[in-house]
Amino acid sequence: MNISRVLFAVVLVLTVSTYECRPRGRILGGQDSKEKTWPFMASIQKNEVHQCGGVLISDKWVLSAAHCATDSNNSSLHVMLGAISLTKPEQYKIVLKVEREIPHPLYNSTKKHHDLLLLELSEKVTLSEAVKPLPFETENIDIPDGKRCLVAGWGQMKSTGKKPDTLQELWIPVISRDVCNRRNYYDNEITPNMICAIEAKKDSCEGDSGGPLVCDGIAVAIVQGGYRRCGLSKKPGIYTLIAPYKSWIMETMYNATLLPSPL
């Protein structure tokens, strides 16, 4: 029996660089999100300050970007779920401690290859219409050029200025890998495990990496990095595809159930 299929079934039951790559997530040209429209969206926080986005993929696990890892003990690391506002009281908002940070073992911090991070929460989430996991893509499919997908974040909305308190969302078209690898784009730096997406003056950008790129109601990629300036038509946002890492994700979550809780 294929172990990855077995582990995927378990997860479903539980859930009901040279191109000057920088952390992304400032949602340029987006709009305020509404309550319960992003029940899977996570705010990863250190000392109660938003650091990165993430996506709830089971009742105990959040997927984010490896460059969001803290390199310190997890005592000050928490995940906020069910939130639209980072600071205002909200009926469905919950905050949970992070028990483990597990970056992909092949993560390359220079080129941001394999830029994925799993966060194990200290306890299982009580699922509701405002807090629930999002299915992620498990098949290595090509996302068509021009396909419009959703991205969201709490990062800055302008090159300078205050970060928003309200979650921003944006429809954004995917760009083919061939185009993104042209010399005047990223000059063959985009691997088969990455995709690009951008629209004029609309982009994810610095300050909110780790959130999901959602196509047809499925998380297909994680906000990764891009050029030092955001919103440039030939320097689109870069995203790490999830499907190529399906086995690592499911096996990591399964193996964690066999380990004692960290002190």
UniProtKB/Swiss-Prot annotation:
Catalytic residues of the enzyme: H67 (charge relay system), D115 (charge relay system), S209 (charge relay system)
Distribution of this protein across tissues and organs: In the embryo, localizes to paraxial regions at the neurula stage and anterior ventral regions at the tailbud stage. From the late tailbud to tadpole stage, expressed along the forming blood vessels including the anterior cardinal veins, posterior cardinal veins, intersomitic veins, dorsal longitudinal anastomosing vessel, dorsal aorta, pronephric sinus and most prominently around the vascular vitelline network, where expression shows left-right asymmetry in the stage 42 embryo. Localizes to endothelial cells.
Domain Peptidase S1: 27-254
GO biological process: protein maturation; proteolysis
Propiece span(s): 22-26
EC number(s) from the headed UniProt entry: 3.4.21.-
SUPFAM superfamilies, per database record: Trypsin-like serine proteases (SSF50494)
Alphabetical list of PROSITE patterns matching this protein: TRYPSIN_DOM, TRYPSIN_HIS, TRYPSIN_SER
Cystine crosslinks: C52-C68, C149-C215, C180-C196, C205-C230
PANTHER family named among the record's database cross-references: COMPLEMENT FACTOR D, KALLIKREIN-RELATED
Family assignment from sequence similarity: Belongs to the peptidase S1 family.
Protein's name according to its UniProt entry: Serine protease ami
Taxonomic source organism: Xenopus laevis (African clawed frog)
Gene: ami
